[in-house]
Amino acid sequence: MGEKLICNNKKAFHDYFIEERFEAGMVLKGTEVKSLRMGKANLNDSFALVRDGEIFLHNLHINPYDFGNRQNHDPDRLRKLLMHKSEIEKLFGKIREKGYSVVPLRLYFKNGLAKVELGLAKGKKLYDKREDMKKKDQSREMAQALRERSKSH
């Protein structure tokens, strides 16, 4: 069956160094799943926190299902993530260190189940972001120069 991507968090790669990745399941309501199947979700500004040995996803916006009735879900509710206890403890230990946070990188369906890929992230400083942009520009210019050179020959 494979994976079907719902949405990416491109901003996370811009704002953070991703050091480690984890996969987690999500506890969802029926209308949330239907909305996700339609691709109506937004990962921007979302983050995960560990509380009482459980991990929760904050600020994940899933649009209300268009054909839902009064049983429709709250778009910005707290969502519990499903992970092994050892993984949660590992994340909690890292989060307590200064500068680390857990951010969702992408939301997808895997074998029919909604999953979120979490990244253990360390915040980038402004000069790091500038450096990354400079590298990206240089690689783009090199690729463009190579294309132009290959066209002329």
From Swiss-Prot:
NCBIfam families: PRK05422.1, smpB. The gene is smpB. Gene3D superfamilies: 2.40.280.10. This is SsrA-binding protein. It comes from Geobacter metallireducens (strain ATCC 53774 / DSM 7210 / GS-15). GO terms for cellular component: cytosol. Residues 129-153 are annotated as: Disordered. One of its GO terms (biological process) is trans-translation. It comes from the Bacteria. Belongs to the SmpB family. Pfam families: SmpB. Disulfide bonds: none annotated.
